[in-house]
């Protein structure tokens, strides 16, 4: 058994050490302006995911939310954060005492990062592989509970009708809360990505009111370690239980388990700028009994509202209660279907380490502020059993390659020594469901999956320097969103530019892909320390409204031009073995007038 298999087996042994596991969307990258109790304004940023997260000012000073105000954080010997008595301010407004506290914080920052890594590593070693995922073919019935709190109720107009449209409708209209910002409903998204093979039907109940206030469930810890999430799920089910005449309709595969229940809760999510007392959007395995031998496997939980700089006033107060985008909901639901996070869950960020906004399981859930999440990639569609990729074995010309969501095909170049490792080639067009993508072009990425099965616990891109699902960037550099932003190594504008230049030709106008270009992730692994060339090169990559055209060549075959028009040959043709042929055969490579050509 290889070490990857051993590691996965160990993870499964640890199933018996824990009963509950959660997976979540990362914090929405962006700055939020808040008004402090002394009347000053402070710009803050949020990082991490629901397992461990933190907040900093625009220059990187750690702060703690206490009672709605942000205080300079103290770091204790265990690396934990607590609020000091000093309100946080922008750099130019800090007095000497605040500056001294920040200097002490800076001297102890290594303790905080060590604690963060320990928390995340512990989580990685105690995640159970539960199975029992939501079926993803045909029509699947899914219960959706609208849950309010004793001190927080739904404020969007007509919540039941609004979420019927949000979840099930083919048309998005504004009902007073920017509902039409969402490009599609959740159902429509999956119908498009599966070419009509998967049609989830969401049955809405509520709103129900839970027995406690929001902070009881959301907790008060700045790092999110005290959420009462299991109690939240149980209370929501208890309040909705009598509204469900027959729970068995939500057991879609007849195994005695309700695969997934969705909860949309009133207010904001902590992952999108909500206060410390709010709940972080997540997918979670809870195993809750609903009677008659039925248990609920997974919960998909996301908030009512979207927090953005364009819908708050100068005091940091929401002035427009926008409905949330579908991106977070779809990301979490995809976990309940078995897909893992493709972002780096350890928060040790590295460039060229993932899919970034090209994948809904990475940062693509937040495209267009999460109102237009990225379509499933070819890899995900194949994992779901919706569309198989075509394996490339010989040189060929591809003309007008369309995206899969438009009926196109995707190709993969497989490592002959390892069937789980391959290069994926697919078309992405900035239109339709992907109209808010960062560019159109040929998306190329490397898959080196550690097992023959995909599981939501996998975290394939956590091995720094050896990502398992990662883009081959045309420009040679795909920045990690975690390294961009105010006070970071890169600006948000630079990150966006790297996205646009990561496809072929892209903004970098790269029209070929060969091994000697030494682009990140364009190779196969021999072992952990050595790589080898892929064995195929791409040439003459062009983009038009009709799709992406290019040549795939076996490495070492020179000067293969665009395919000839099929006609009666007027000169001699020879095979690569030097045998003359009178009539060329479609799809084969020949020597013709001292050039290699593919006959069509």
Model-inferred region functions:
Residues 5, 588-600:
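C-terminal tail/sorting-segment detector
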Residues 23-131, 416:
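N-terminal prosegments of processed precursors
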Residues 1-26:
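Bacterial Sec-dependent N-terminal signal peptides
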Residues 99-329, 340-349, 447, 452-554:
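Propeptide-to-catalytic entry region of secreted or membrane-anchored zinc metalloproteases
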Residues 42-44, 52-56, 72, 81-83, ...:
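Short, solvent-exposed loop/turn elements at domain surfaces
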Residues 260-262, 266-439, 449-450:
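Extracellular hydrolytic enzyme modules, especially secreted metalloproteases
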Residues 33, 328, 571-572:
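A residue-level detector for well-ordered beta-strand positions
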Residues 553-580:
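Residue-level detector of functionally pivotal "anchor" positions at catalytic/ligand-binding pockets or at interdomain
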């Amino acid at each position: 058994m290889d070490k990857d298999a051993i590691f996965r087996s160990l993870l499964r042994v640890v199933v018996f050490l824990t009963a509950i596991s959660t997976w979540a969307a990362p914090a929405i990258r962006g700055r939020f302006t808040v008004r402090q109790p002394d009347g000053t304004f402070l710009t803050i940023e949020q990082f991490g995911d629901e397992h461990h997260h933190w907040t900093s000012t625009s220059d990187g000073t750690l702060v703690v939310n206490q009672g709605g105000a942000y205080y300079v954080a103290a770091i204790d010997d265990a690396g934990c954060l607590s609020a000091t008595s000093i309100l946080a301010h922008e750099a130019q407004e800090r007095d000497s005492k605040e500056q001294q506290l920040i200097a002490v914080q800076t001297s102890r920052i290594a303790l905080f990062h060590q604690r963060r890594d320990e928390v995340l590593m512990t989580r990685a070693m105690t995640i159970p592989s539960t199975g029992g995922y939501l079926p993803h073919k045909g029509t699947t019935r899914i219960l959706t509970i609208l849950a309010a709190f004793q001190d927080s109720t739904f404020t969007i107009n007509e919540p039941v009708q609004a979420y019927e449209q949000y979840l099930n409708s083919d048309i998005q209209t504004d009902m007073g809360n920017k509902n039409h910002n969402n490009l599609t409903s959740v159902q429509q998204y999956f119908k498009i990505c599966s070419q009509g093979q998967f049609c989830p039907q969401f049955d809405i109940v509520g709103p129900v009111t839970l027995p406690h206030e929001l902070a009881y469930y959301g907790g008060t810890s700045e790092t999110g370690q005290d959420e009462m999430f299991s109690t939240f799920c149980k209370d929501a089910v208890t309040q909705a239980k009598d509204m469900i005449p027959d729970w068995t309709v939500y057991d879609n595969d007849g195994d005695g388990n309700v695969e997934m229940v969705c909860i949309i809760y009133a207010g904001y999510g902590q992952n999108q700028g909500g206060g410390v007392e709010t709940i972080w959007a997540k997918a979670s395995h809870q195993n809750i009994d609903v009677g008659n031998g039925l248990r609920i496997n997974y919960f998909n939980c996301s908030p009512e509202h979207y927090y953005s700089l364009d819908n708050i006033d100068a005091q940091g107060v929401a002035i427009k209660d926008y409905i949330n985008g579908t991106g977070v909901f779809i990301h979490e639901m995809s976990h309940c279907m078995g897909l893992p996070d493709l972002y780096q869950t350890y928060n040790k960020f590295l460039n060229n380490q993932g899919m970034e906004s090209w994948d809904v399981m990475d940062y693509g859930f937040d495209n267009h502020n999460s109102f237009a999440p990225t379509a499933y990639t070819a890899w995900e569609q194949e994992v779901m059993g919706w569309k198989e990729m075509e394996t490339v074995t010989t040189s060929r010309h591809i003309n007008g390659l369309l995206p899969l969501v438009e009926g196109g095909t995707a190709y993969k170049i497989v490592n002959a020594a390892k069937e789980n490792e391959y290069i994926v080639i697919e078309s992405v067009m900035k239109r339709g469901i992907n109209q808010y993508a960062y560019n159109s072009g040929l998306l190329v990425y490397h898959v080196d999956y550690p097992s023959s099965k995909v599981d939501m616990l996998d975290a394939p891109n956590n091995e720094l320097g050896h990502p398992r699902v990662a883009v081959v960037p045309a420009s040679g550099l795909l920045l990690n969103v975690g390294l961009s932003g105010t006070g970071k190594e890169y600006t948000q504008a630079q990150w966006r530019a790297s996205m646009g230049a990561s496809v072929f030709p892209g903004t970098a106008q790269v029209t070929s892909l060969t091994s000697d270009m030494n682009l990140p992730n364009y190779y196969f692994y021999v072992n952990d320390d050595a790589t080898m060339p892929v064995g195929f090169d791409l040439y003459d990559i062009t983009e038009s409204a009709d799709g992406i055209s290019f040549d795939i060549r076996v490495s070492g075959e020179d000067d293969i031009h665009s395919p000839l028009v099929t006609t009666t040959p007027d000169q001699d043709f020879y095979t690569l073995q030097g045998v003359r042929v009178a009539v060329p055969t479609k799809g084969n490579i020949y020597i013709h007038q001292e050039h290699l050509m593919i006959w069509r």
